[in-house]
């Protein structure tokens, strides 16, 4: 099995609920190491740049507005099959469809305020990680 890295964002709704530690515990209990982390308040330009791939989608403006509504916690996770493992921990995008015990089932309110973001592929993970972190600020352990 390959050791991978993936980007994870704890979104404004989950930060406001003060469940950062509970989400971190789930990452670590699943064998994912947090190798970089920071809390940031995204600007409109930051959010638009990060989600540029969705620019033509009908939900783009609402997504950007939501992501700048409060601070987020951005982290790099590392571990065996990190991309898939993180996506399984998150659960379905719509929390109503998420399996019980997943982050979104337990902490998300709606398809928009869905607690977490996670890279959907290794290729996107590399791009997303570089968007938020210089290589010199990532510490494998």
Curated annotation (Swiss-Prot):
EC top class, as a word: transferase
Organism of this sequence: Methylobacillus flagellatus (strain ATCC 51484 / DSM 6875 / VKM B-1610 / KT)
GO molecular function: ATP binding; metal ion binding; nucleoside diphosphate kinase activity
PROSITE patterns assigned to the protein according to its UniProt record, in alphabetical order: NDPK, NDPK_LIKE
Function: Major role in the synthesis of nucleoside triphosphates other than ATP. The ATP gamma phosphate is transferred to the NDP beta phosphate via a ping-pong mechanism, using a phosphorylated active-site intermediate.
Subcellular location: Cytoplasm
Family: Belongs to the NDK family.
Active-site positions on this chain: 117 (pros-phosphohistidine intermediate)
Pfam families: NDK
Keyword annotations from UniProtKB, A to Z: ATP-binding, Cytoplasm, Kinase, Magnesium, Metal-binding, Nucleotide metabolism, Nucleotide-binding, Phosphoprotein, Transferase
Coiled-coil stretches: none
Binding site for ATP: 11, 59, 87, 93, 104, 114
Biological-process GO terms, alphabetical: CTP biosynthetic process; GTP biosynthetic process; UTP biosynthetic process
SUPFAM superfamilies in UniProt: Nucleoside diphosphate kinase, NDK
Name of the protein this chain belongs to: Nucleoside diphosphate kinase
GO (cellular component) term, any one: cytoplasm
Subunit text: Homotetramer.
Required cofactor names: Mg(2+)
Catalysis performed (reactions): a 2'-deoxyribonucleoside 5'-diphosphate + ATP = a 2'-deoxyribonucleoside 5'-triphosphate + ADP; a ribonucleoside 5'-diphosphate + ATP = a ribonucleoside 5'-triphosphate + ADP
EC number(s) given by UniProt: 2.7.4.6
Designated gene of the protein: ndk
């Amino acid at each position: 099995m390959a050791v991978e890295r993936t980007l994870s964002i704890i979104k404004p709704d989950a930060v406001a609920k003060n469940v950062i530690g509970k989400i971190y515990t789930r990452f670590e209990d699943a064998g994912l190491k947090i190798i970089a982390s920071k809390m940031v308040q995204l600007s409109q330009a930051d959010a638009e740049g990060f989600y540029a791939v969705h620019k033509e989608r009908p939900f783009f403006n609402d997504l950007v507005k939501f992501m700048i509504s409060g601070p987020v916690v951005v982290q790099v996770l590392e571990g065996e099959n990190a991309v898939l493992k993180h996506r399984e921990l998150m659960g379905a995008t719509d929390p109503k469809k998420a399996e019980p015990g997943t982050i979104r089932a337990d902490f998300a309110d709606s398809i928009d305020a869905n607690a977490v973001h996670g890279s959907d592929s290794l290729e996107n993970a590399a791009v997303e990680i570089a968007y938020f972190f210089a290589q010199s600020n990532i510490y494998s352990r």
